[in-house]
Structure formats: structure tokens, C-alpha cells
């Protein structure tokens, strides 16, 4: 399970990232893919990268398999678990841009600068149920894609095929589908950041005991529906911040509030599900911030002239 988040600051700079909530770590680390790095495809012609990319992931046979990544132009994408709903094509379709589902991360960040361009191109994309190699299964994912102007959600399901949704609340979690989550927000329209006031109930004065009464009923558990509601509510109501430091703090404050704490969720395999890492990319400074469940120190990595022009992957 996972939570994705995006917002902009008072200058229009994007802050975008995610929690990765799983039952184990995968040996993931920060990866910078420079320009002119080999980029193989399953169904398209092999090529080389045109834009530098930074994000978290693992390297598989020289291929940077990202969990979330961001290009030098400020366009980013994160893949989140979408179990029971994700259904990719059984094979390539003539006349379509055929991508193995894992390839969408680098295809998006290599070919586009703006979400509007991605939305148009996706009309001709077919995502194929093809793993990176025989050691890996196909992950049932959906994706949040964002620049500083807007965000979209991309889902492929058996019932609806590929659907692209505008994401005005700047949040994504897991199943059910995104449209269900938007509908569910209607159950929480009574939430308000302002405290309730004293009332008279048939002559009996009834007054709140303390602060926070306006948000009474805000979910706090770890199911995807409730993480979506809480993250969306906090994202909408958190004041717009000024400066990089304040906005990075804002980002981590929101996502840590929906983090899965080790020991609080045990999956059907008997493993703890927990937030392995939290990460945020700042488009203004081209900086990737992250910390881990077992190491809360905030680490920073930058796309700069050295890393963007490296002759090989830069891994940390």
C-alpha cells in the first residue's frame, strides 16, 4: 500500500512524492539516470535517455526500475499498488504505443515536459502485462503523474480499460479505483478545520472540551480509503508555505500523518506492512528528499551538472 501527494508553493514550484508502504524493503535506493543512457523497450525501438531523471527504485540488469521518479523539467510519476483492479493487456496491439507496464515510468519522464502532453499521448498507449524479467512478477499498479500545473491518475482495469482522471486534490492511495475515492469524499463534507461552538440542546448547554472538534470524524486508520480522505483533507487545508524548507516540512508532515507504523498492520502472509520510505521532489531546486523507517534523518540528492551528465547510473 502507498500514498502519493503533490502540491505547489506560493511561487508555483512543485513538491511531489510518496510513501512506500509494503511488507519488506527491496534494497531500494536513490537512482539518477543521466542523459544519453541506454533505454531498452520490450515492444518499441531501443533508444537512449534524453532527460535526466532522479527517484527511488532498484536497478535490474542495468535498467533503473523506479518506484517514483522526476525528470529535469519537473514532470514526475509514482506507481502505487492497485490490487484486484489493475488489468493490463495480454499482448501488443497493432497501431498502438505498446509499453510493458513497468516501462511507463521512464517513457513518461523521457518524452514529456507537461502533464497535458502526457494526457494526449496516453490516448494511443497500450500497457502490456509484461514483467521486466522472469525473476519478477508484473506489479498491479496505477500511477499519479504531475507537473507544477496539474496532476492526473492513470488506471487500467478489466472493467474500464485505460482511464485518465484529473486529480485536483493532489492525492492517490490504492484500491478501489480513483473515481470511487472521489465519490467517497462526499461522506466527509462536514469536516472543517475550525472548532465547533457551544450549543443549547433543549436548554442544556453543550460545549466542546478542547480543540479539533471541527475535524471530528477524520479517519486515522491505514486502509486506502481512509488514508486518501485524511491526506486530501490535510493537503487542502494546510496553509500555502513560503520557501523550500517550509514546504518540505509541510510535505513530510502530511505524509507522516498517514504513514503505516510497523506493528500496526500485519498482512495475510503474517508480515508487517509499514512505510519503508517517504520521499519528496522539489522541482524548484531539483532536489530529492527522503527518509526511511529505520533512519529518520532527512537525506537530500540533487540533479546537477555532474549527475545529469554522468556516463553511468548514479546510485546511492
Curated annotation (Swiss-Prot):
An annotated GO BP: lipid metabolic process
UniProt GO molecular function: hydrolase activity
NCBIfam families for the chain: bile_salt_hydro
Catalytic activity: cholate + taurine = taurocholate + H2O; taurodeoxycholate + H2O = deoxycholate + taurine; taurochenodeoxycholate + H2O = chenodeoxycholate + taurine; glycocholate + H2O = cholate + glycine
InterPro entries on file: CBAH, CBAH/NAAA_C, Ntn_hydrolases_N, Peptidase_C59
The name this protein goes by in its record: Conjugated bile acid hydrolase
Residues that, per the record, bind taurine: 81
Domain of life from the UniProt record: Bacteria
CDD domains documented for this protein: Ntn_PVA (cd00542)
Protein activity control: Glycocholate hydrolysis is inhibited by various previously identified BSH inhibitors, including KIO(3), NaHIO(3), NaIO(4), CuCl(2), menadione, riboflavin, gossypetin, and the antibiotics oxytetracycline, demeclocycline hydrochloride and methacycline hydrochloride.
EC supergroup of this enzyme: hydrolase
UniProt-annotated binding residues for deoxycholate: 2, 18
Active site: 2 (nucleophile)
Keywords, sorted A to Z: Hydrolase, Lipid metabolism
Source organism: Lactobacillus acidophilus
Gene that specifies this protein: bsh
pH dependence: Optimum pH is 6. Rapidly inactivated below pH 5 and above pH 7.
Amino acid at each position: 500500500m502507498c500514498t502519493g501527494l503533490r502540491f505547489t508553493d506560493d511561487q508555483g514550484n512543485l513538491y511531489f512524492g510518496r510513501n512506500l508502504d509494503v511488507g519488506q524493503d527491496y534494497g531500494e535506493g536513490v537512482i539518477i539516470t543521466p542523459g544519453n543512457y541506454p533505454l531498452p523497450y520490450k515492444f518499441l525501438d531501443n533508444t537512449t535517455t534524453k532527460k535526466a531523471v532522479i527517484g527511488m527504485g532498484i536497478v535490474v540488469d542495468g535498467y533503473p526500475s523506479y518506484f517514483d521518479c522526476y525528470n529535469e523539467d519537473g514532470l514526475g510519476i509514482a506507481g502505487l499498488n492497485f490490487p484486484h483492479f489493475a488489468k493490463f493487456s495480454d499482448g501488443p496491439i497493432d497501431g498502438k504505443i505498446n509499453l510493458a507496464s513497468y516501462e511507463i515510468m521512464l517513457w513518461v519522464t523521457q518524452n514529456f515536459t507537461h502533464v497535458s502532453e502526457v494526457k494526449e499521448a496516453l490516448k494511443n498507449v497500450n500497457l502490456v502485462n509484461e514483467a521486466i524479467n522472469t525473476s519478477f512478477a508484473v506489479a498491479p499498479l496505477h500511477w499519479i503523474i504531475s507537473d507544477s500545473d496539474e496532476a492526473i491518475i492513470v488506471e487500467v482495469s478489466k472493467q474500464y480499460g485505460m482511464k485518465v482522471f484529473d486529480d485536483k486534490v493532489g492525492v492517490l492511495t490504492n484500491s478501489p479505483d480513483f473515481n470511487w475515492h472521489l465519490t467517497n469524499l462526499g461522506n466527509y463534507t462536514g469536516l472543517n478545520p475550525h472548532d465547533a461552538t457551544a450549543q443549547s440542546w433543549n436548554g442544556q448547554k453543550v460545549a466542546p472540551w478542547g480543540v479539533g472538534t471541527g475535524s471530528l470524524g477524520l479517519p486515522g486508520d491505514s486502509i486506502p480509503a481512509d488514508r486518501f480522505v485524511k491526506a486530501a483533507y490535510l493537503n487542502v487545508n494546510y496553509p500555502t508555505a513560503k520557501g523550500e524548507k517550509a514546504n518540505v516540512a509541510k510535505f513530510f508532515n502530511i505524509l507522516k500523518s498517514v504513514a503505516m507504523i510497523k506493528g500496526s498492520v500485519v498482512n495475510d502472509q503474517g508480515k508487517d506492512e509499514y512505510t519503508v520510505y517517504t520521499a519528496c521532489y522539489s522541482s524548484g531546486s531539483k532536489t530529492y528528499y527522503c527518509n526511511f523507517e529505520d533512519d529518520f534523518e532527512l537525506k537530500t540528492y540533487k540533479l546537477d551538472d555532474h549527475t545529469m551528465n554522468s556516463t553511468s547510473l548514479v546510485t546511492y
